[in-house]
Amino acid sequence: MTTVQQRFAVPPDVLWNVLPAGVAAIGGQQPVYDGPRGFATCRTGMSLLSWGQHINVTVSPSEGGSTLTIMTVLKLGVWDWGEGKRIANRFAAAVAYAAGTAALT
């Protein structure tokens, strides 16, 4: 399990509206968006080197903007060998690019 958290100087609704860009960047499948709770989830598919990951994303208000939290969990296995962190960082970078801003932290 890997968790990546980044703050942005934009309102939560701006990040929420560009979450599909993050899903597309990681090749996410079957996305589910729960707007009232600020929660989204998707999964990555299996490949030659991976069984795939479950990705849970929350967007929450924070001082001066909003916070994006991305948590990845292996579908099967014990170690992800850094795959979860790479996926979470790719997701966050795509969201930042689509929102036209950079992460504060």
Describe the residue ranges of each PLM region.
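Ser/Thr-rich, low-complexity intrinsically disordered terminal regions
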Residues: M1-T105
